[in-house]
Amino acid sequence: MSTTSRREPPDLAALLRKKKEEEAAAAKPRFIPKKERERLEAEKKAKEEEERKRKEEAKPQPNGTNHNGNRMDGIQSHHNHNPQRNIPTGPKAMRYDDDRGPNGMSNGRDYRDNRDNRDNRDRNQRGAKRGAPNDDEEKRAKMERNDEAELRARYMGPVVNQSTFSAKKKRRRTAANKFNFDWDADDDTSRPFDPIYAERQEPLVRLGGYEMTEEMVMRKAEAIRRGDPETGEERARQYLEQHRRIKEMEQRKNLGKHWSEKKLEDMKERDWRIFKENFGIATKGGAIPNPMRSWEESTLPRRLLDIVKNVGYDEPTPIQRAAIPIALQARDLIGVAVTGSGKTAAFLLPLLVYISELPPLTEYNKNDGPYALILAPTRELVQQIESEAKKFATPLGFTVVSIVGGHSLEEQAFALRNGAEIIVATPGRLVDCLERRLLVFSQCCYTIMDEADRMIDQGFEEPLTKILDAMPVTNEKPDTDDAENPQLMSRYVDGKDRYRQTMMYTATMPPIVERIAKKYLRRPAIVTIGNAGEAVDTVEQRVEFVSGEDKRKKRLQEILNSGQFKPPIIVFVNIKRNCDMVARDIKGMGYSAVTLHGSKTQEQREAALASLRNGQTDILVATDLAGRGIDVPDVSLVVNFNMATNIESYTHRIGRTGRAGKSGVAITFLGPEDNDVLYDLRQIISKSSISKVPDELRRHEAAQNKPQKGQKKLEESNGYSGKGGSWN
């Protein structure tokens, strides 16, 4: 044979590469047409039918032959021509002796096992004859192992607890036939060199809430320039200008800023809602203006703002923020605010703006009465309001006069001889002046009722009604929607008088107060600051269960001697005759003390308050007479030597401290006689953020449920009755 016809040896690398390609092609999913699938299905069914027929032909017959008449075991004769016996056997009678049990009976299970072993051995021997010549040694070794196993089973018994586990039976899974769900690199159609995908384009359509960046804006402007050589430059400039204006508008809206960082014109409804929540302002009524955020943003005249700054009012209180804008629109107002919230300035400043627009008092009109009237329940509160009003009215040239009991009518008539724009009075003494023709209200068009609920509690409903009925009716507001229109209510009636404006400030709204408000106020705006009847958060409330006068005096001495509280200090008692007793004991402790109750004359009351305010006296011992409306600066401690008979009086007592944003402490002594108010006391303390309800009060039986019966009242408990208790 020549060298040209000689076969070249196969290339191993080529074979491996070809095999890998075939495997990869087989692993990849391939689409098969429908006709091809039908043909393959028919071929598969034909093969299965052929295989089934072949198996039926090879199935053995009952006589041990197949369909061809041959023996299934390959033996053609009944005689065994195997000349070799591997295992020697004994006589037939003794061959199965070992298989018998103790009673001479054979063990059927062992007999069957040995018979099976012999059949296997004979079958192996017969199969050895049919094996290929190159498998003789392997088969001979296998037969020897079987013979050894048979001998062991015969003479040593069967193997017990032999594991049938075989490691060869474990099949290892290969990844050859595992389906690959990933795309092959050849299937990628987004080729980098494709010009379509060479430069990615940003979509111009955006979903809601998407903000275009400066880079995208410049890119779009550049695309406009390239796409339109003629007018592209101008269009791109207009597009950038439009984007700049939109951005400025968004910055003006800027909902993310806090209301304190925004300008007044940028405030939205959401900002005003947050503002009111921050200051605890709640308003009710139609056409109510927004509160003022600062003094500078109010519509008060510049001259009045300068006076406010000189007085020391840096920031308005919540009631001032809400009430002043409403009052400046000539609206009737009901203010419900906690004690010590700055109500006095809230109604004084709009009052001064109102009367500054009226003609000044002259010799011709000074006898027609004042322009404004302020009513208060107690003499001390009247004098306090008068003092506060003079701070603002005197620089503006207005006169303020107080009319209270305890002074002679001649003295007060002399004070009114030159007329007064503002009169501050108690209802009782003011009715006396009206009945004696010392005063008229012919031109009074501004009325303020401070502590209206307190005036009703003291029995001033009838005097209050007489005073309000004495007001002129020609300038009374209509009870229609026009009363809510600030433009209409700011006009003059018949060219000379303005519409009458009435305001009422109260801590609670009992039915009598509501009836008066409904009768004399027209479509009022209602302003509520915080929760009515609750103590301010600047007062830390403490309660102690101390029964007996002696124990309470001893505990009071311990508190005063602790050095934690500086003067002035106020001690409240329920019965006015106890004032002098407690004051005498306090003086025995080494402290100066004065008393204030209904039996004191007006001169004594004024002297007591003046000595406390001036620092000449350390401690004031008083009944509820001083518990409401009295403003003594820097009171550090209030001691309720006797718990008030109702929770409203308790609230006003402790309101004497913690005023004007300062902190204070209120300590209350409790006894068995106070069970009727323990439930309300627990509730009001639990609502305070700086106070803690003591365990003894929390577990007390009377503090668990609100009492059903009426509250217990002590004789002369309020300090207003008895000799010398007249308010006039």
UniProtKB/Swiss-Prot annotation:
Motif range (Q motif): 293-321
Binding residue positions for ATP: A337, V338, T339, G340, S341, G342, K343, T344
UniProt short sequence motif DEAD box, positions renumbered to this chain: 450-453
EC number: 3.6.4.13
Gene Ontology molecular function: ATP binding; ATP hydrolysis activity; first spliceosomal transesterification activity; mRNA binding; RNA helicase activity
Name of a matching Pfam family: DEAD
Domain Helicase ATP-binding: residue ranges: 324-527
Gene Ontology biological-process entries: mRNA 5'-splice site recognition; mRNA splicing, via spliceosome
InterPro entries assigned to the protein according to its UniProt record, in alphabetical order: DEAD/DEAH_box_helicase_dom, Helicase_ATP-bd, Helicase_C-like, P-loop_NTPase, RNA-helicase_DEAD-box_CS, RNA_helicase_DEAD_Q_motif
Helicase C-terminal domain boundaries: 538-701
Enzymatic reactions: ATP + H2O = ADP + phosphate + H(+)
Nucleotide-binding found in the keyword field: yes
Catalytic class of the enzyme: hydrolase
GO CC list: catalytic step 2 spliceosome; cytoplasm; U5 snRNP
Disulfide bonds: none
Residue stretches in coiled coil: none
Compartments, record wording: Cytoplasm; Nucleus
Compositional bias annotation for Basic and acidic residues: 33-59, 109-125, 137-153, 693-703
Domain comment quoted from the record: The Q motif is unique to and characteristic of the DEAD box family of RNA helicases and controls ATP binding and hydrolysis.
Function in brief: ATP-dependent RNA helicase involved in mRNA splicing. May destabilize the U1/5'-splice site duplex to permit an effective competition for the 5'-splice site by the U6 snRNA, resulting in the switch between U1 and U6 at the 5'-splice site. May also act to unwind the U4/U6 base-pairing interaction in the U4/U6/U5 snRNP, facilitating the first covalent step of splicing.
PANTHER family (UniProt xref): ATP-DEPENDENT RNA HELICASE DBP3
Subunit structure: Component of the U5 snRNP complex.
Similarity comment: family membership: Belongs to the DEAD box helicase family. DDX23/PRP28 subfamily.
Protein name: Pre-mRNA-splicing ATP-dependent RNA helicase prp-28
